[in-house]
Amino acid sequence: MPIGLGLACSHAPNVFIPPEHWDVRYKQAIADVPQPLAAARETLEVRRGYAARIERAFEVLRDKLAAYKPDALIMVTDDHNEMYDENLCQPSIAMFLGERGTGILSLRYNDDAEQNAKRFTVTCDQELAAYLANGLVQMEFDLALTRTPETRSLGPEDRGMGHGFTRTAPKLMPDLDIPAVLLWLNCYFEPLPTAKRCIDLGRAIAELCRKRDQKIAIFGTGGLSHDPRGPRGGWVDEPLDRSVLQALANADLDRLRSLFLLNSDTYHGGTGEIRNWLVVAGAMGDCGATIVDYMAVHHIITGVGFAYWDPAKSI
């Protein structure tokens, strides 16, 4: 049956911690980059307001997912040199075929013993993952396949999956009761997949899911504009973010296909994670996104966005 729900959100680390602690990550991520005047206006009171909006937005996504009650959730994120690295392998597309993925809730640069102890497990739909992997290869998408959900080059080996999954999975499904299919895109390291390739990947996934007798949802996480530790660290390209969100709302896939064709510093760094949203947009086809919220937050170093695609709402 057709994919019945799409979800997307940002996964910048400060999205998941109290605003009182945002300064730690903010100072790490901006390095020596001069900051915009707007950053100084983000007082603790302002940051608390952003944090409240973030939690309300997650609540909307949680409610949509709980109401749909999918049999499986396809989760699309990117690798940050955690699962893969340039000395081993950096695939454009990778899929997890293991029985379960594990992770911990703490951020790798925070020495938080309590959070480090909070290991969680996501059960994976191995049969659906294998079906999608085989089908995508037949549709000329060359996938890397893995059965080991462990980080490679950042932090201790037992941290499990990268933070694109470990931070978002418990927020979306607190009971971790929906079998998942885990899919990685390369969004940081050249050569990068084009926007068209990402949209086509989503369309191919949707075509394969249509042949299944399962209720399936798809979730993309990352972005929007940000450049941690890069030359634009702390700066947010709000016009770009709003343009992308408007195109998603309009289901304007033709416009989105050209997104990364021009060479721009803005497209480098974390902004490339918009590719994960494009996979969802491709999977949802003519269904436009409902934009739940958007915030250009310098102390999160990110354009923070939340959206969902509900075909039933579009009828």
Whereabouts are the PLM-identified features?
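Flexible, D/E/H-enriched segments
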Residues: 1-70, 90-199, 211, 231-315
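Beta-strand elements within well-structured catalytic alpha/beta cores of enzymes
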Residues: 71-78, 183, 214-224
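Active-site microenvironments of hydrolase-like enzyme catalytic domains
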Residues: 73, 77-98, 225-226
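A contiguous pocket-lining binding segment that forms or flanks enzyme active sites
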Residues: 205-207, 215-217, 221, 225-241
